[in-house]
Structure formats: C-alpha cells, structure tokens
C-alpha cells in the first residue's frame, strides 16, 4: 500500500486518537480467503484492491461512477484501513482486479506502477474521462501532485494536442513535461488565466481540477472557453461544497 495525501488529513487530525484506526485506501496484495458468492478471484490470486467498492450492477456502476455505488456499505464507498496485514474487501467480484502472475514476477518499479492503479492513476484518468477529453483538445491540469501528474498522462492518452500544467514546483514541472505536458504556468488567479489563454490562443477545451480548493475550481472555470468541460476530482476541502 502507499500513503495518499488525504491519509495525512486523518494523521494530522487532533480529534482522532492515536491507534484508533489504520490509514490507507489503496493496495495490491494476495487473496487469502473468499466468500461463497465470489467467483472472479480465488485464494492465491494477485490483485489490485482499488479505493472504491462498486457492485458492478447498479445504475451508478453501469454509468462508470462506482465511487457512488448505490449499494455501498457504510457512510462512504471509500476503502479504509488498508495499511494493515489483512483487509476485508466488499464487492470483490466486480471491484478486485486480478493481476497476472505473482508479485515475485515483477520488479519493484513495476509493483509501484501497479499500486498506482488502485487510486491515483484511475483518479487522474477519471478527470479526463468526465471532461470528455478527445483527440486534438487543449487541456489544462490544475494541481501538480500525484493525481495531477496522472491527469497529464491521461490527457495525453486521450489525444490532447496541448496540455498546460499549472504548477509552482520545478521538480513536478519537469515530471509533467516528461509525461506529456506541453507547457507550464506558475501564475495564479487572473494572471494565471491570462497566461494560459495566451499559450492556448484562447480558452481550454477541458480543465482537469485535481486540488479541491475553491481557488483551484475558480481557476479551472476561468481557463475554459464557453462550452468548455471540467473534470473535478480534487477532494473538496472548503465549506461550500454545492
């Protein structure tokens, strides 16, 4: 498993006592036991355990939004506590993804890449998907963390002709440029919007918001031309979530 930025919110929360719960919501591992209804995986299988538990049968899952599965258990459909020796995974028939072979068949780098498919890469791809990024589109990615980096990769996979990353960190800029970004904008606010529009020769066809702040959402809306599309995957951390 790995540490997501959202795990740190819980870790740093003074209202949560130490030892009360495990962090983590994305993992790869070996199936130890299965329930009677499970037919798609068996003990010994190497699998990706994603951060959502879609049933694969409801309207939300059929529409490709398993994160809001109509049949989810508990208050949310996110995994919790996977930084543990064993975890219980609901809706395994549809949600667990079998990986060919065993962990020993892969290098450490390949295992880390597979782990990214449990959350961060699908989240970045989901931003591009819901924004309907298509070949030739001009795309802006707001957020240069792991999800933003994966959104850059996803936009390139979808055939975007220009990909502008809004970032202030040199190492993250270099990573994104190596992954397919065509330009970087460090400015924010109206200055940043003007810079993006200058680079693209107008507004963007799609904006992929990967931060979750009001400022980031305003930035995403500001860089779009009329009729542009926004993929919003940043976890909201502000009061107004309408």
How should these model regions be labeled?
Residues 1, 12-59, 100-107:
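Glycine-rich beta-strand-centered segment in the early N-terminal region that forms part
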Residues 6-12:
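Cytochrome P450 core scaffold surrounding the K-helix E-X-X-R motif
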Residues 46, 138, 228-229:
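Short glycine-centered segments of the SAM/dcSAM-binding site in methyltransferase folds
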Residues 55-142:
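NAD(P)H dinucleotide-binding glycine-rich loop of Rossmann-like/cofactor-binding domains
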Residues 127, 151-154:
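Hydrophobic residues within alpha-helices
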Residues 141-144, 149, 156-219:
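Adenosine-nucleotide cofactor-binding segment
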Residues 160, 211-242:
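Glycine-rich phosphate-binding loop and adjacent beta-alpha segment
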């Amino acid at each position: 498993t790995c540490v997501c930025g959202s795990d740190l919110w819980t870790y740093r929360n003074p209202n949560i006592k130490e030892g009360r719960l495990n962090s983590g919501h994305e993992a790869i591992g070996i199936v130890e036991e299965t329930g009677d209804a499970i037919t798609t995986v068996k003990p010994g299988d190497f699998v990706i355990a994603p951060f959502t538990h879609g049933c694969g049968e409801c309207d939300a899952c059929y529409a490709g939004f398993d994160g809001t599965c109509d049949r989810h258990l508990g208050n949310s459909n996110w995994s919790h506590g996977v930084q543990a020796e064993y975890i219980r995974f609901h809706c395994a028939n549809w949600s667990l993804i079998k990986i060919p072979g065993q962990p020993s068949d892969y290098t450490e780098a390949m295992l880390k890449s597979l782990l990214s498919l449990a959350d961060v890469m699908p989240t970045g791809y989901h931003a591009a998907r819901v924004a309907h990024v298509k070949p030739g589109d001009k795309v802006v990615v707001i957020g240069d963390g792991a999800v933003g980096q994966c959104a850059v990769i996803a936009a390139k996979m979808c055939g975007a002709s220009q990909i502008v990353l809004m970032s202030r960190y040199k190492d993250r800029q270099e990573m994104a440029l190596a992954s397919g970004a065509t330009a970087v904008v460090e400015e924010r606010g109206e200055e940043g919007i003007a810079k993006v529009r200058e680079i693209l020769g107008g507004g963007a066809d799609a904006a992929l918001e990967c931060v979750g702040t009001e400022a980031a959402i305003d930035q995403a809306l500001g860089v779009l031309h009329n009729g542009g599309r926004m993929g919003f995957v940043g976890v909201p951390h502000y009061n107004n979530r309408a």
